From Swiss-Prot:
Originating species: Pseudomonas fluorescens (strain Pf0-1)
Gene Ontology biological-process annotations: biotin biosynthetic process
Keyword annotations of the record: 2Fe-2S, 4Fe-4S, Biotin biosynthesis, Iron, Iron-sulfur, Metal-binding, S-adenosyl-L-methionine, Transferase
Pathways per UniProt: Cofactor biosynthesis; biotin biosynthesis; biotin from 7,8-diaminononanoate: step 2/2
Gene: bioB
Described function: Catalyzes the conversion of dethiobiotin (DTB) to biotin by the insertion of a sulfur atom into dethiobiotin via a radical-based mechanism.
InterPro entries in the cross-refs: Aldolase_TIM (IPR013785), BATS_dom (IPR010722), Biotin_synth/BioAB (IPR002684), Biotin_synthase (IPR024177), Elp3/MiaA/NifB-like_rSAM (IPR006638), rSAM (IPR007197)
Positions bound to [4Fe-4S] cluster: 59, 63, 66
Lineage start: Bacteria, Pseudomonadati, Pseudomonadota, Gammaproteobacteria, Pseudomonadales
Cofactors demanded by this protein: [4Fe-4S] cluster; [2Fe-2S] cluster
PROSITE patterns assigned: RADICAL_SAM
Family affiliation: Belongs to the radical SAM superfamily. Biotin synthase family.
The protein's name: Biotin synthase
Residues reported to bind [2Fe-2S] cluster: 103, 134, 194, 266
Known catalytic reactions: (4R,5S)-dethiobiotin + (sulfur carrier)-SH + 2 reduced [2Fe-2S]-[ferredoxin] + 2 S-adenosyl-L-methionine = (sulfur carrier)-H + biotin + 2 5'-deoxyadenosine + 2 L-methionine + 2 oxidized [2Fe-2S]-[ferredoxin]
Amino acid sequence: MSASTTATLRHDWTLAEVKALFVQPFNDLLFQAQTVHRAHFDANRVQVSTLLSIKTGACPEDCKYCPQSGHYNTGLEKEKLMEVQKVLEEAARAKAIGSTRFCMGAAWKHPSAKDMPYVLKMVEGVKAMGLETCMTLGRLDQDQTEALAKAGLDYYNHNLDTSPEFYGSIITTRTYAERLQTLAYVRDAGMKICSGGILGMGESLDDRANLLIQLANLPEHPESVPINMLVKVAGTPLENADDVDPFDFIRMLAVARILMPQSHVRLSAGREAMNEQMQALAFFAGANSIFYGDKLLTTANPQADKDMQLFARLGIQPEAREEHADEVHQAAIEQALVEQKSSEQFYNAAV
């Protein structure tokens, strides 16, 4: 199968086709992925995002990989919903170190009615700084997606995690169909989709292929596809899972690039365990987005200065961002404070 034929957008991939991509010689796969990548992106630019946990721990879901699940004793301290001012201060810091997108994550099964007004103000404030906005809040209903879109949310993250066949071995508190329904609501509301999965949970090659097929065969490809390598956390059921072979991880990125040629493929969780050579291979395979900063929700991430040093050595530049003066950042923070104090719909999230 030539690179030129896979550079077109398809939504009808079969398991046989995708497995054939996975098992071809490594150099052939990377050549094909890089060729597709260059047809749609500047191969020497990477989109940079920062992820902030706005509500940590005590999640009612039982995802076996997650240290935030209330089902497991991981030593993670529960934190309540962060206040708007603090979120906007963190967003300003993220932009100052080069992020173009600010992602906010809450450890919920779904956001409650009392939380939504607060979350919407976060979106509005971050958007006012000129940053792209992204949130991951769990399952959404149609009204919630429409409210987030109206507030200016650009991306909603809702990962499929793995294949439909393997999913029940990892999560029992939310169905695969519910995840797909949330993605449909997000798309119908006019927002962009961020959705991917995790390697290293005991899944098979078929499972990895079927995860990518689920994503690539959606009516529209996700604009962002995060590929995570399991971060093994003591206290979770997967703390002793086998390591992912580095070449298998690179193959996953390359096949994702070929199947979804116009999507940003994000090198996401697990990057702390990757050496510079593996990260360089990931970029060559078509990864063109990273999370930037010292922490990814609750697990370590390479330090920001190390990322910039690696970019410099590889000749990679962060994607361009919209510039706003410091006064705009401060005005957004101050406006959020005024609205929070004057509106009776807000509650003290620190209590």
